[in-house]
Amino acid sequence: MAYFISFEGIEGCGKTTQLKLAAQYLRTLKIPVGTTEEPGGTPLGKKIRNILLNRGPFEICAEAETLLFVAARAQHVREVILPSLARGQWILCDRFSDATAVYQGCVRGIDEAWIRQLDSFATSFLKPNLTLLFDLPAETGLHRAMQRMTGIPENSREDRFEQEGLNFHEKIREGYLALARQESERFRIINAAADIPSIHREVCRHLDVLRQQPEAGLP
């Protein structure tokens, strides 16, 4: 049985590091696993990622931003995620639909019902079997994100969201926690302020629970 798992959280929460460690863990168990990210994961998605995350000479309105994220996701689902699951390969995805619901819905103010409808069309109603939410104070995450950018040439930085103020990131955190309360069966909240090995052990516990479940289809 192949499972689809998304890794979510504010900037600097460490989800990307934990995704890589989780993939390594599953491979030690001889479980076929692929890793991917949003926006990205496909040639089209990478071009859209470059537009969305790199600072440029133009502004992107919230509506255009939303449509670009969802367009990248539509291609990603059909080109990468669904074919991989059909082959029996687990997929670990760095952000998925919840990120759009939070960043563009809760924070940018785009109508959340419209986002859900648009996203359902783009994904053919696909949802992760499990979503790991890496939670920590927004100030801590933003500090980590800024440290991560140190030494990276300015024209190579994917930092458009990191450049937002603390209030923006606090709203992102609140939005994620609200989603986790609404869909508590799918979400698992992980204390991302802990050290990397401790967080990894908790991630592995959740993966072990998932792989011991009786076979079932995707939500």
Swiss-Prot record:
Q: Which Gene Ontology cellular component terms are annotated? A: cytosol
Specify the superkingdom: Bacteria
For molecular function, the Gene Ontology terms on record are: ATP binding; dTMP kinase activity
What does the entry list as the binding residues for ATP?
9-16
Role this protein plays: Phosphorylation of dTMP to form dTDP in both de novo and salvage pathways of dTTP synthesis.
Looking at the keywords, is Nucleotide-binding present?
A: yes
Q: What is the lineage of its organism?
A: Bacteria, Pseudomonadati, Thermodesulfobacteriota, Syntrophia, Syntrophales
Name the SUPFAM superfamilies for this protein. P-loop containing nucleoside triphosphate hydrolases (SSF52540)
- What is the catalytic activity of this protein? dTMP + ATP = dTDP + ADP
The record's annotation in Pfam families points to: Thymidylate_kin (PF02223)
Which of UniProt's keywords are assigned here? ATP-binding, Kinase, Nucleotide biosynthesis, Nucleotide-binding, Transferase
What is the name listed in the Swiss-Prot or TrEMBL entry for this protein?
Answer: Thymidylate kinase
Q: What is its EC number?
A: 2.7.4.9
**Protein source organism:** Syntrophus aciditrophicus (strain SB)
